[in-house]
């Protein structure tokens, strides 16, 4: 329980630090980009440790199941609520109570701040997939707080 609170506090402080370094409208995109790059590096390191003793994955779906179950549980203390795919390289991971958004108020005015709180996690997933050998683009969307959807588009090489 304590480590969860520490992670949430550290995450919000990182957002505040990066946001204070970048001010203005055009810098908002730069802030999101920096947060995603931080998450990318952390995701690479975490997945390396988590898959150290894991047998090789059979296919993309196997990798995504690992991300949704084991990886997500290690980072956020719960599994993804829903995983959907079109079997053509697009996966949608849905978390109905995303821990990093639960601290924000559910009002519509806070939806504009949500991308900053999701950028690190997008980078985390992209970095994890990259280190496994899966090139991807990860985006996130929030329609109702604190639920969010992460869309993972696998890029074929």
UniProtKB/Swiss-Prot annotation:
Keywords: Endoplasmic reticulum, Golgi apparatus, Neurogenesis
The UniProt record lists the keyword Transcription: no
Gene Ontology biological-process entries: endoplasmic reticulum to Golgi vesicle-mediated transport; nervous system development
Signal peptide range: none
InterPro entries registered for this protein in UniProt: NO_sig/Golgi_transp_ligand-bd, TRAPP_component, TRAPPC6/Trs33
Major subcellular site: Golgi
Role of this protein: Component of a transport protein particle (TRAPP) complex that may function in specific stages of inter-organelle traffic. Specifically involved in the early development of neural circuitry, likely by controlling the frequency and amplitude of intracellular calcium transients implicated in the regulation of neuron differentiation and survival.
Assembly mode: Homodimer. Part of a TRAPP complex.
Sequence similarity: Belongs to the TRAPP small subunits family. BET3 subfamily.
Protein name: Trafficking protein particle complex subunit 6b
Organism, as annotated: Danio rerio
């Amino acid at each position: 329980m304590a480590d969860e609170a520490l992670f949430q506090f550290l995450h919000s402080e990182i957002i505040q630090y990066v946001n204070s370094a970048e001010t203005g409208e055009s810098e908002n995109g730069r802030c999101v980009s920096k947060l995603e790059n931080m998450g990318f590096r952390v995701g690479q390191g975490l997945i390396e440790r988590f898959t150290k003793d894991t047998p090789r994955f059979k296919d993309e779906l196997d990798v995504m199941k690992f991300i949704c179950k084991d990886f997500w549980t290690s980072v956020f203390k719960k599994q993804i609520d829903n995983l959907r795919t079109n079997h053509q390289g697009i996966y949608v991971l849905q978390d109905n109570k995303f821990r990093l958004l639960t601290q924000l108020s559910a009002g519509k005015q806070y939806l504009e701040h949500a991308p900053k709180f999701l950028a690190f996690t997008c980078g985390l997933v992209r970095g994890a997939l990259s280190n496994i050998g899966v090139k991807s683009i990860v985006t996130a969307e929030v329609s109702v707080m604190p639920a969010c959807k992460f869309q993972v588009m696998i890029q074929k090489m």
